[in-house]
């Protein structure tokens, strides 16, 4: 959110593949763990990497960077410049955990989009 990384969440799908159904169906029961269960050092590292990806890619507004954590290293999968904003989407869930109401999140996105850069 701007220059701030809101947080990291871990997803544990109960399906073989993390596909559309696993992402967007309440019946899929993908487990969301917030905050991601990482050491303080690793948590700060993944937030730093997300901010770095946002900056290097010259992104604006809200982005969501997806990582795999394997053998104690983070691997960037993608940076999503238009993350979902549904009831099951991750950005609103992470923002809520950080104390940011959905209406305030949307308000910030609209205001940020209106700035000329």
Regions found by a protein language model. Give the residues of each.
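Internal helix-turn-beta structural module
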Residues: 84-92, 96-108
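Catalytic core of tubulin tyrosine ligase-like
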Residues: 4, 9-14, 20-23, 27
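Conserved metal-phosphate-binding beta-hairpin within the catalytic cores
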Residues: 1, 55-85, 95
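Short clusters of hydrophobic/aromatic residues that line enzyme substrate/ligand-binding pockets
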Residues: 20, 34, 85
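Cysteine/selenocysteine-centered motifs that mediate thiol-based redox chemistry or coordinate metal-sulfur cofactors
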Residues: 105-117
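A long amphipathic alpha-helix within ATP-dependent nucleotide-binding catalytic cores
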Residues: 26-71, 112
């Amino acid at each position: 959110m701007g220059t701030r990384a809101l947080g990291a969440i871990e997803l544990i799908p109960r399906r073989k593949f993390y596909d559309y159904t696993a992402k967007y169906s309440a019946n899929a029961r993908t487990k969301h763990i917030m905050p991601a269960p990482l050491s303080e050092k690793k948590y700060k590292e993944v937030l730093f990497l997300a901010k770095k990806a946002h900056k290097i890619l010259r992104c604006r507004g809200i982005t969501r960077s997806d990582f795999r954590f394997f053998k104690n290293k983070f691997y960037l999968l993608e940076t999503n410049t238009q993350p979902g904003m549904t009831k099951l989407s991750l950005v609103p869930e992470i923002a809520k955990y950080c104390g940011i109401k959905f209406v305030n999140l949307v308000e910030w996105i609209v205001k940020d989009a209106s700035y000329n850069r």
